Swiss-Prot record:
Cellular component terms (Gene Ontology): plasma membrane
UniProt keyword terms in alphabetical order: Cell inner membrane, Cell membrane, Flavoprotein, FMN, Ion transport, Membrane, NAD, Phosphoprotein, Sodium, Sodium transport, Translocase, Transmembrane, Transmembrane helix, Transport, Ubiquinone
Subunit structure: Composed of six subunits; NqrA, NqrB, NqrC, NqrD, NqrE and NqrF.
Protein name per Swiss-Prot or TrEMBL: Na(+)-translocating NADH-quinone reductase subunit B
Co-factor(s): FMN
Length: 414
């Protein structure tokens, strides 16, 4: 009760006419973080519900935690394994002293030797992920608050989700200044200039990643950015398949074949939060059960992916190994699972009619496979497929609504 009374006592200072009026957006953000606002909709139609936008966003934020924690562990695991493969003894000590992620891990009680356990791996992964997330949150939060102060409205909670999603779809070695640029583009260009939360037609996190991909491709693609080990170069499993098919899926450190279960669990290099389909499915099950994510979109993506990948399997190719990738491998490689569960289901940039959701999902699944298979320069396709489908989402809804109007007119007359 003490905190609530304190917030109520200072509220009048931030209301119109108060001495801190211009800082209302910051006060409202802090107050509603702990308590549900007492505001209600003044005009029809409205629905009373105990779950507001902030609670919905917090649930989505929590839903990505399994993928986030596994991603940090996997970054540490891949990096420590690669370091001990490349260096030993004095060489390893020299490498550790020259990389602040490494020596910070050891200073906090971790080890980068072959005896490293899960705690050391998690700790090393955290030294890569948390700075990226903090940078994205602070820079993106600055733009959110700035636009809210200019427009004189409350801070929208959607950024809690945008920030963590963006941090999870980039490589662990991404320079922090590029992370700041990417989230700036996503928040300002893809969302705020169109009116802010609820008015953007593109997914802000994906738009920010697309900006980095085209502006700074060397730091977000290739073979050297996925494993945070100095001097190590290794392609993602998706790139390996594109180069040589299933037989090319080899762990570069151990020399062992990468199995489907390795990819499903997430024991492969890749973007921080995209590697584990299992962890992503756990989080997705939660938001689908809570009614936040649409199962129709997820099912549509699967239908589109399975249909087109099967078609390419039937056609076959002696020169393009991606033609022969079966649907169950498309599911676990690259950013397909992350995009299907957490990006395609964005309620703002996706279709909102039930039939439109099916068409929207099918388009994403089909486009992803087509880009992966047909485009020789870009083996990943989920990011571009979702952004492409975002442009068609209003059209799908328009067609569904118009057909519904015509059907009702035909049934009941004009």
């Amino acid at each position: 009760m003490g905190l609530k009374k304190f917030l109520e006592d200072i509220e009048h200072h931030f209301e119109p006419g108060g001495k801190h009026e211009k800082w209302f957006a910051l006060y409202e953000a802090a107050a509603t973080l702990f308590y549900t606002p007492g505001l209600v909709t003044k005009r029809s139609s409205h629905v009373r519900d105990s779950v507001d936008l902030k609670r919905i966003m917090i649930m989505v934020w929590l839903a990505v935690f399994p993928a986030m924690f596994w991603g940090m562990y996997n970054v540490g695991h891949q990096s420590i394994t690669a370091l001990n493969h490349l260096y030993s003894g004095a060489e390893l000590a020299t490498v550790i002293s020259g990389n602040w992620h490494y020596w910070l891990t050891e200073m906090l009680g971790g080890t980068l030797s072959t005896q490293a356990g899960w705690a050391s791996m998690m700790l090393l992964g955290a030294t890569y992920f948390l700075p990226i997330y903090a940078t994205v949150f602070l820079v993106g939060g600055f733009w959110e608050v700035l636009f809210c102060m200019v427009r004189k409205h409350e801070v929208n909670e959607g950024f809690f989700v945008t920030s963590i999603l963006f941090a999870l779809i980039v490589p662990p070695t991404l320079p922090l200044w590029q992370a700041a640029l990417g989230i700036t583009f996503g928040v300002v260009v893809a969302k705020e200039i169109f009116g802010g939360t609820g008015r953007n037609f593109l997914n802000p996190a994906l738009a920010g990643r697309a900006f980095l991909f085209f502006a700074y491709p060397a730091q977000i693609s290739g073979d050297v950015v996925w494993t945070a080990a100095d001097g190590f170069s290794g392609a993602t499993a998706l790139s390996q398949w594109a180069q040589g098919g299933n037989g090319a899926l080899i762990n570069k450190v151990t020399g062992e074949a990468i199995t489907w279960m390795d990819a499903f669990v997430g024991n492969i290099p890749g973007s921080i939060g995209e590697v584990s389909t299992l962890a992503l499915a756990i989080g997705a099950a939660f938001i689908v059960y809570m009614g936040i994510a649409s199962w129709r979109i997820i099912a549509g993506v699967m239908v589109g992916m399975i249909a087109i990948s099967t078609l390419f399997n039937v056609i076959g190719s002696d020169t393009n190994a991606m033609f022969n990738m079966p649907w169950h491998w498309h599911l676990v490689l690259g950013g397909f699972a992350f995009g299907m569960f957490f990006m395609a289901t964005d309620p703002v940039s996706a279709s909102f009619t039930n039939k439109g959701k099916w068409a929207y999902g099918i388009l994403i699944g089909a486009m992803c496979v087509m880009i992966r298979v047909v485009n020789p320069a870009y083996p990943e396709g989920m990011m571009l497929a979702i952004l492409f489908a975002n442009l068609f989402a209003p059209l799908f809804d328009h067609i569904v609504i118009e057909k519904n109007i015509k059907r009702r007119l035909a049934r009941y007359g004009k």
